[in-house]
Structures are given as structure tokens and as C-alpha cells.
Amino acid sequence: MSQSAEIPYLLRAARGEVLDRPPVWMMRQAGRYMKVYRDLRDKYPSFRERSENADLAIEISLQPWRAFQPDGVIMFSDILTPLPGIGIPFDIIESKGPIIDPPIRTQQQIDHLHPFDPDQTVPFVKTILKTLRQEVGNQSTVLGFVGAPWTLAAYAVEGKSSKTYSIIKSMAFSEPAILHQLLSKLADMVASYVRYQIDCGAQVVQMFDSWAGQLTPQDYDVFALPYQQQVVRQVKETHPDTPLILYISGSAGVLERMGKSGVDMISVDWTVDMAEARQRLGKEMKVQGNIDPGVLFGSQSFIRDRIVDTIRKAGNQGHILNLGHGVLVGTPEDNVRFFFETAKNADQLLVHA
């Protein structure tokens, strides 16, 4: 077996190799659109149990692997999972989302946050990642994932999901010193968590700054970018060769700024044309994405055309095919299967198209 054949396909793309087709996986590929997941959810209704019980999280992570054989298998978890480990408890209410009560809004609360010890507070992550590596071998790449400091702070300060982010923006624009302390502590936690995931078996780690797209570009430069950089800098000091991906929803206005974070790859959302994203980010930056999740509700010929279009625009080096957001609830499983089958035969499509 050649050395390149021993390296998982997605990892080769993340390292910048020229490939016949891009590797493919989907954000939220394990989730509610799959009947096997819904059946398991009915039996175990607590999201935290599903994501923090290692056996359940392993099973859920592997459901799309068994069904579709994606080139990437991502750990089933939540971006808030590490927060209790520094003193921010949370719960997840089905159909309502995360709740943090009390929310973090005072200097005293921030002073009481403590350093993150993943072995003590998230030991199940080690079991999940080590088992996933054993299960998929070199046939797929195991991805870890974390939330970025701004997005974690948004949940912690707001206390829940928000449409306006008025509470954290009030803190940012009236008491910035307090928020900067929180962001720095969260960045240290995230960096420690990324390193832990890599040590436990993650071969690539994606950082989600889901709500950074709610910031103006000038505020992104103050409250999001420096803390993304803090995470990346700390991780690269100890794990320089592990590819890091950054994803932001609604990122068209800050795309170039994302490239300054220090990550190896930018996951582009569907609001930016992939050819434009390539141009704006520069040829050295690798990209992931960026098909509109709504495309998976379309006809098979439409799905096929969008796959080919995206691959052509991204080029044959440094691209991972993905959606521009997570798989939507209600997406037909047959269309997801068709998406993966088509993507994995894209080299043939590109020759004949």
C-alpha cells in the first residue's frame, strides 16, 4: 500500500494535495433527518445524555458512516459541552435549545470561572474519539469540533439563543473590559479542549463561530478575531500539523477576516459564490463547502448540477465538499444518499460533464 493510500482521503485534502475529487462530509450529518437517529432520540430524549454518554454518542456519530460512508466522521457533541468544566452549567431543552441559568453578566461571575481540566470534566470525549478512530480506520477522517469564544460568550451572556444578541452587544459596547476577560478565558478553554480532542484521536478539528456573522466587520476585529487567533496560536504551539477549520454562518461580510484567524481552512457558507470565496481568500487558503442545504430538497439532477458547479469553482486542490450549513430537519434521506454517492463519483462526472 502506498503511503498516500494510508492517509485518510479528507486529511490529504486538508493538507493541500491535488486530488481527483474532493472528500465529502456534511455538517450535522448525524441528526434528526435520519430515522435511526429519531428512533434513538425517542428512547433517549435528553440531548445531553445522547452527546455525553459515550456509547450513545459513538452510535450516533457512526449512523451516517454506516449509511453513506462519508470521508469525514465528526464526533456527535455540542459546542457548549465543555462549559460546565469552567463553571458555566447549561441544559438543552428539546425544541427550545440551550439554556444557561444564571447567565454570565458580572465581573464576580467571571472571576469565579476556573481552568478547564478535560480529563476530569469531559472524559467521555476521549472514549468517543478513540472508538471512532478504531471503527473507521483509514477509511474516513475523524473530526473533532468546538465552539469559538465569541459564540460561546454569546450563549453564556444571553443565557439562550437570541435573534438580536442585544445583551452581549450591550456588554460589548458599554462594558467591553468585562467581556474581553470572559472571551480570553473562553479562548484558553477552547484551546485546551482542541488539544485534548487531538490527543484523543481527532485528525481535524472544526471551530464553529456560529454567531460571529452577527457582528459588524469592525466589531468582529475586536471581539471575535483576536480570540479565534488566541485559540489557534495555542493549539499550533503544541499541534502544528493538525488542520483546523473555521466556520461562521452568514460570513460573507467577514470572509477575508476569517482568513486572518490562522486556521488552515475556511468553511464557506452558501451565501458566497465558491469562485468568489476562492478569489477573496487567496489561493493559499483551503476551503470547505458550500452547497445550500436547501438543494437537498431538489431533484437529483439539480443536486448533481450543484455538486459539479461547486467542485469546478473550488478547484482540485485544498477543497472539502460540504454544505454551507448543517443538514436541515426533514431533508429526504434518499437525497442525502444520492448526494454522497454523486460526490464520491465526482471525478467521473467532471470528465463527462
UniProtKB/Swiss-Prot annotation:
Site feature (Transition state stabilizer) residues: D78
Reactions it catalyzes: uroporphyrinogen III + 4 H(+) = coproporphyrinogen III + 4 CO2
Metabolic or biological pathway, per its Swiss-Prot or TrEMBL entry: Porphyrin-containing compound metabolism; protoporphyrin-IX biosynthesis; coproporphyrinogen-III from 5-aminolevulinate: step 4/4
UniProt GO molecular function: uroporphyrinogen decarboxylase activity
Lyase is among the record's keywords: yes
Binding site for substrate: R28, Q29, A30, G31, R32, D78, Y155, S210, H325
Any GO BP: protoporphyrinogen IX biosynthetic process
PROSITE patterns with a match to the protein in the record: UROD_1, UROD_2
Enzyme class, UniProt record, top EC level: lyase
EC number per UniProt: 4.1.1.37
Subcellular location per the Swiss-Prot or TrEMBL entry: Cytoplasm
Superkingdom: Bacteria
Record SUPFAM superfamilies: UROD/MetE-like
Keyword terms, alphabetized: Cytoplasm, Decarboxylase, Lyase, Porphyrin biosynthesis
GO cellular component: cytoplasm
CDD domains (alphabetical): URO-D
NCBIfam families: hemE
Quaternary structure, from the entry: Homodimer.
Family of the protein in this entry: Belongs to the uroporphyrinogen decarboxylase family.
Protein name, as recorded: Uroporphyrinogen decarboxylase
